[in-house]
Amino acid sequence: MAMRVDQTCGSEEHSPASTQRSAQLFADACAVIPGGVNSPVRAFNSVGGTPRFITSAGGYWLTDADGNRYIDLVCSWGPMLLGHAHPAVVEAVRKVAEHGLSFGAPTPSETELAAEIIDRVAPVEMMRFVNSGTEATMSAIRLARGFTGRAKIVKFSGCYHGHSDALLADAGSGVATLGLPSSPGVTGAAAADTIVIPYNNVAAVEDVFAHFGDEIACVISEASPGNMGTVPPLPGFNAALRRITAEHGALLILDEVMTGFRVSRSGWYGLDPVEADLLTFGKVMSGGLPAAAFGGRTEVMSRLAPLGPVYQAGTLSGNPVAMAAGLTTLRHADDAVYAKLDANADRLAGLLTGALTEAGVAHQVQRAGNMLSVFFTDAPVHDFAAAKATETWRFPPFFHALLERGVYPPCSAFETWFVSAALDDDAFARIAEALPAAARAAAAATPEGTA
């Protein structure tokens, strides 16, 4: 059963008096920004209450405009794996900024970061930097079409690849949170060449290629989806995508905007080394600043302008501040950091399982490396249909019970939880103290209570 979506701006249902400043800031924002936010999931529409306006962060702590502090289990939706305001990253950004923010010209740091990524991810032989994950996937799709001379693309229900028109069809992330099948403004023509099939279903992939094989330019999939909740590929699924696309002369694009350099030094490729033709990156690779990238084998990437005819450009692409933040983050994310991230995810998953089991709540804590999600169901979730069928109405009271006790989880049942390497024993003690009440709130929830 899907949760109710509250489309109002500034609901006070779950907002204690200590959020008065955030409430005022939200009201001010609603007057000049649609919905008061610049990315829909931030509006708390699916959980109710007032979005917390964050004014500072350090390590694993977030501080809001009212002075409330929260243990951060969102990490800016993934990038802050070292923790907030890591001294080395801050210093690198400061040093670069002193010499200028953007030049509209090549800089050495672009080549350095590209070389670092190429060294980590074997299928990537050349890179192009852009400004967002949406740009990365949109550009990769254009390149795949230009390379193959074909028009159709295949994506999976619940996989989110940014908000370009062709990729919004049956997407996850905010589209799932808002209960929208796509988006008004996406024309039939824009989506006509997008084929959407169930995730983790090899037979569906084979069937669509049997019908449209010589028309399909590419298959795009999240390397391990995190935008319908954490729903990892079944063993061999990505390898099957590689096999089927190769058999039909189509390209395989694996979207690692979320998983790239988050789940391992080499991203999801380090855990499941399937050699895609193109990969997309973002979040961690830019250290939390606006930058992303796509890359792949030279034969494909050399079709990009100015070498080839496929056009792609960006005024701020490869800006030196984001390059410095990304390069410093990657160089500090050594094996010890990834071991700490995995251990922290293990610890959080154990606390979640223990509290929810004690409260008698049917649940699944699903993992993809150090990424995880909580689904309120007694069966594993392998696709978007199963994710939408979970008891999502238990999530709002669960979320608010944690928030009111100083723990900041994702504000949607369809988003992934992220840990940082900064989390320590004190943080986990506080999380452990908050979870029993949250689990009891989930247990007491009813569909009518959040309808």
Swiss-Prot record:
Cofactor(s), names only, from the UniProt record: pyridoxal 5'-phosphate
4Fe-4S listed as a keyword: no
Primary location group: cytoplasm
GO molecular function, one term: pyridoxal phosphate binding
Assigned keywords, A-Z: Cytoplasm, Isomerase, Porphyrin biosynthesis, Pyridoxal phosphate
Keyword Signal belongs to the record: no
Pathway participation: Porphyrin-containing compound metabolism; protoporphyrin-IX biosynthesis; 5-aminolevulinate from L-glutamyl-tRNA(Glu): step 2/2
GO cellular component terms attached to this protein's record: cytoplasm
Catalytic activity entry: (S)-4-amino-5-oxopentanoate = 5-aminolevulinate
Domain of life: Bacteria
Chain positions found as N6-(pyridoxal phosphate)lysine: K283
Cited InterPro entries: 4pyrrol_synth_GluAld_NH2Trfase, Aminotrans_3, Aminotrans_3_PPA_site, PyrdxlP-dep_Trfase, PyrdxlP-dep_Trfase_major, PyrdxlP-dep_Trfase_small
Pfam families: Aminotran_3
Gene Ontology BP terms: protoporphyrinogen IX biosynthetic process
Extent of the signal sequence: none
Compartment list: Cytoplasm
Subunit structure: Homodimer.
Similarity field: Belongs to the class-III pyridoxal-phosphate-dependent aminotransferase family. HemL subfamily.
Identification of the protein by name: Glutamate-1-semialdehyde 2,1-aminomutase
Gene this chain is encoded by: hemL
